[in-house]
Amino acid sequence: MDGNGRWAEQRGLPRRAGHRAGAKSARRIIEAAARSSVDSLTLYAFSSDNWSRPREEVSHLMHLFKRYLQSEISRCIENGIRLNIIGRRDRLNPELVKIIEQAETLTADGERMLLRVAVDYSARDAVAFSAHYTDPNCTCLSGGNERACFEAALARQMHASVPAGDVDLLIRSGGERRLSDFLLWECAYAELVFVDTYWPDFSEHEFEAALKDFDGRERRFGGAPVAERSTHPQAEAPHYQ
């Protein structure tokens, strides 16, 4: 959700006006995702690096997020949307943490779509913490499935109450062409769509266009293109000891 501040500055408005407009855009895209039968949607609301912004802006963002959560709980319940806030919680205001936990509990039965919101989130921190805290007695390790054990630790560290799995499509607004420390592990084979539109102006039409673009792509996950697979026998993956 990139470009809120620049959207406001272009209009001679304070940055907080851009963040408020961005919250309205988030609601539109959540509704569009639910209508499009998207199983899981993750919004990058506040990165760990965002703490370096001016104190007044950070305070406004946290207040806005708290109000947004409180206002959206009933809407999520009505529409079968399950909320999960991922990221660190030890640096958040205790009152906000309580509201997060309440929102997750009240929406836990939602089955239509999983909505994850990343707050105080850093993918590099998540990977580093998980590597450090992976349980050496994890049964997955003895079975040779180190990745499953690591991913379980990753989910615990980031308060991911529901495993969302790998990211299929990453959409970034605001004209930037980089991942910015977002879901680096989960985006290993994600398709990327970058748009110049600032987040407050990002529309349902652009969201649906990105989904259509994704549907037209051939995803190989390291394999050969379809044409080559049809003419060559499938090679067995090498075994390393």
List the model feature ranges, each with a label:
Residues 1-241:
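Flexible, compositionally biased loop and terminal segments
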